[in-house]
Amino acid sequence: MKITVLGCGALGQLWLSMLHQQDHDVQGWLRVPQPFCSVNVIMLNGESFNRNLTTNDPKHLLQSELLLVCLKAWQVSSAVTALLPKLNPECKILLLHNGMGTQEELPLNEHVFLHGVTTHAARRDGNTIIHVASGMTHIGPTSSVIIDDNHLADTLHQALPDVAWHNDISAACWQKLAVNCVINPLTGLYNCRNGDVQRYPELIERLCAEVASVMEMEGYHTSTESLLSYVNNVIRSTADNTSSLLQDLRSQRHTEIDYITGYLLRRARSHGMALPENARLYELIKRKESDYERIGAGLPGSW
């Protein structure tokens, strides 16, 4: 399969390495055009992948059957919009990022958009990407358009298992959003690993109650209890992980909070609902972000 991976960070390099090893015709795409990208990944089994892979080849992009978007949520709109005229109409676009709300920012177009939520974890250590935790990737459309692309799910599963197809991914996206609304701001606020947020059970319950109330208004059957159970399971299973938002704060990068808690607050506002706990955490993270962005020269640009 001919694939372009947009964004060559930790997750992008992980997918590039895995797809290349399955003999797919894959390239990366960088914001600043370069002829190749040095992909250095240490796999879960300790083996290393070190290759210079092609990047930013417009002919490859035009012929691509899949654009796999591995950017931060706030980078997606401008980057994908710039590439839309350069893609063939049959090219599917799979968005793999934390949070929700990016597709609404894109111009109307004819492409099939798919969303993915993943529990794979990778981190950067210098010039090397370390695959620190295997996981599950769920993909599918968020619209009511009937698409059945188990073949794509199977292709991706062969490269980086497990991958499952959903005819409507929306519920899975909201579940992941609930987890992110708890783990990301709390780890960012308290500068701790995922497991350490278990010290704040009452706060976690209040956050889950607010998320559940919005999900109910959005048409998803859930409860505070079921959401709390799910979130706590994820906290325990990822206890040693450092959240992406905390990594961003420590590196003084722009975070994805506007597409995590920010998205939740926007949906709540549309239903006339107030979410005091989530709103408080959102403001605290934005304050941390603005402290260093005011000193720096605007948003970091590399992806």
Swiss-Prot record:
Pathway in which the depicted protein is active: Cofactor biosynthesis; (R)-pantothenate biosynthesis; (R)-pantoate from 3-methyl-2-oxobutanoate: step 2/2
Any one GO molecular-function label of the UniProt entry: 2-dehydropantoate 2-reductase activity
Active site positions, chain numbering: 176
Chain sites annotated for binding NADP(+): 7-12, 98, 122, 256
Catalytic activity from the UniProt record: (R)-pantoate + NADP(+) = 2-dehydropantoate + NADPH + H(+)
Ribosomal protein in keyword set: no
Binding site for substrate: 98, 180, 184, 194, 244
GO CC field: cytoplasm
Keywords annotated in UniProt: Cytoplasm, NADP, Oxidoreductase, Pantothenate biosynthesis
EC number in record: 1.1.1.169
Localization annotation: Cytoplasm
Primary location class: cytoplasm
InterPro entries reported in the protein's UniProt record: 6-PGluconate_DH-like_C_sf, 6PGD_dom2, ApbA, Ketopantoate_reductase, KPA_reductase, KPR_N, NAD(P)-bd_dom_sf
Keyword ATP-binding: no
Function: Catalyzes the NADPH-dependent reduction of ketopantoate into pantoic acid.
Family, per entry: Belongs to the ketopantoate reductase family.
Protein name: 2-dehydropantoate 2-reductase
Organism: Yersinia pestis
Source taxonomy: Bacteria, Pseudomonadati, Pseudomonadota, Gammaproteobacteria, Enterobacterales
